[in-house]
């Protein structure tokens, strides 16, 4: 698994304190079913048969039990919530990205002058670039991602949806707005606009 449980626990604690922690379970009998936890701006999903004892222990620690298939609830209210997944993808083609960014290898994050973490993923015909919250980026084990033969799918979605890191086993979502909907003073917007030729498809 590519999730650092100690870092994830830190995010879960903050979300619980803020009253935004959600824990749920997809139908684990299905191919991509599994368990998930989420805060107000992030979500982590792990496929059912790949969930480690440590990950399940975190769920039990915060909820007192393992949720049943199809069950989703907020820790602070116990009320059923609607699904939080699904969005339209958009990409930043590699030919529009500055040479300095193109040189960054898969799975690398760098601190920008604006204080955000810039994550980069290189595909054969396109380069995906996005700014993420450092606390969330720390949850991902980029070393394991880069060493794994089965390169994870990493994509960027818009409309207050998610940036997803992952593959069939697990992924982490970082919630953010589409660049066109961001306030002018939004750090993530400034990071994206600083990359020459940023285009949304």
Which residues fall in each region the model found?
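Intrinsically disordered, low-complexity linker/loop segments enriched in Gly/Pro
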Residues: 1-46
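C-terminal functional regions that serve as terminal interaction/effector modules
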Residues: 39-42, 53-201
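Short Gly/aromatic-enriched secondary-structure transition segments
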Residues: 48-51
């Amino acid at each position: 698994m590519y999730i650092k449980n100690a870092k994830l626990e830190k995010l879960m604690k903050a979300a619980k304190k803020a009253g935004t922690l959600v824990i749920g379970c997809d139908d684990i009998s299905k191919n991509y079913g599994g368990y998930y936890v989420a805060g107000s701006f992030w979500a982590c999903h792990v496929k059912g048969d790949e969930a480690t004892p440590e990950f399940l222990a975190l769920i039990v620690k915060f909820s007192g039990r393992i949720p049943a298939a199809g069950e989703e609830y907020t820790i602070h209210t116990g009320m059923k919530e609607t699904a939080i997944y699904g969005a339209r993808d958009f990409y930043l083609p590699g030919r529009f990205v500055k040479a300095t960014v193109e040189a960054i290898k898969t799975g690398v994050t760098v601190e920008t002058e604006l204080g955000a973490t810039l994550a980069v993923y290189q595909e054969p015909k396109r380069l995906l670039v996005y700014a993420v919250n450092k606390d969330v980026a720390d949850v991902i084990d980029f070393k394991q991602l880069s060493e794994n033969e089965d390169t994870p799918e990493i994509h960027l979605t818009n409309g207050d949806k998610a940036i997803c890191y992952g593959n069939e086993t697990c992924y982490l979502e970082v919630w953010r707005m589409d660049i066109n909907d961001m306030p002018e003073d939004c750090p993530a917007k400034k990071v994206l606009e600083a990359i020459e030729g940023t285009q949304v498809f």
